[in-house]
């Protein structure tokens, strides 16, 4: 397994992430996959600019929504890096399943392809995308219907991006959720990243907090 889960890369610089991508290829070919169609191309253009700032210029857009190209998707495994962008993870999950991306990502995970996932894209690789629903629903509602929102499950914990921007009341909901849903939640500040080499084990850079059964526990080892 070769996964990097981040809060906002490349919008916040992270040398460790850049180094891992460069280790995959000197001039990596990167598949940029958003949750839904980028109608005016603005998101892709901005992503290209940000990746260009760290000298990655071979960025290709893969649409899994309105302009789905199954032939293009069939060659996903040929990219050096697969990048799952930010966005609504509930919609991302729906489109990934509908387009067949979810199955292809599972294959890429099992074959050790490098996948970099940010924010909503990172949630797609966890067991469930229900953390996002806490923004608009109660803990009780989210837990009661959590079974309908299972995701790829490449890692065993759920991920909360942008924890440095969250209000205390929302963090309290996440702590309750971790207890009532019986799941670990790993919270990432902007600029942080997890480097997952197996379903349960990761190293990290930046500020990372782990919640378990409603409590804050120690995180795993820092990456070099």
Please identify what each model-predicted range represents.
Residues 1-26, 38-49, 81, 131, ...:
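C-terminal and late-domain segments of enzyme folds
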Residues 13, 92-93, 126, 133:
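Glycine/Thr-rich phosphate-binding loops of Rossmann-like dinucleotide-binding domains
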Residues 15-75:
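ATP/NTP phosphate-donor binding region
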Residues 70-81, 93:
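N-terminal small/polar loop signature for handling phosphorylated ligands or for N-terminal nucleophile
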Residues 89-99:
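Glycine/threonine-rich flexible loop motifs
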């Amino acid at each position: 397994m070769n996964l990097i889960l981040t809060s906002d890369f490349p919008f916040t610089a992270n040398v460790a992430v850049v180094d891992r991508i460069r280790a995959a290829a000197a001039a990596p070919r990167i598949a940029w996959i958003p949750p839904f169609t980028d109608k005016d191309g603005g998101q892709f253009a901005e992503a290209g600019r940000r990746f260009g700032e760290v000298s990655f210029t071979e960025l290709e857009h893969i649409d899994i929504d309105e302009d789905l190209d199954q032939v293009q998707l069939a060659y996903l495994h040929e990219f050096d890096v697969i990048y799952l962008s930010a966005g609504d993870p509930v919609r991302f999950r729906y489109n990934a399943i509908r387009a067949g991306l979810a199955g292809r990502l599972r294959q890429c995970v099992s074959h050790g392809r490098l996948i970099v996932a940010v924010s909503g894209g990172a949630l797609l690789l966890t067991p469930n995308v229900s953390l996002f629903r806490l923004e608009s629903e109660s803990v009780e509602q989210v837990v009661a219907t959590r079974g309908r929102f299972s995701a790829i499950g490449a890692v065993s914990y759920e991920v909360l991006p942008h924890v440095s921007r969250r209000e205390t009341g929302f963090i309290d909901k996440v702590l309750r959720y971790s207890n009532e849903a019986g799941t670990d939640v790993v919270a990432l500040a902007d600029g942080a990243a997890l480097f997952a080499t197996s379903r349960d084990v990761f190293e990290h850079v930046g500020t990372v907090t782990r919640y378990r059964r409603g409590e804050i526990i120690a995180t795993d080892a820092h990456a070099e």
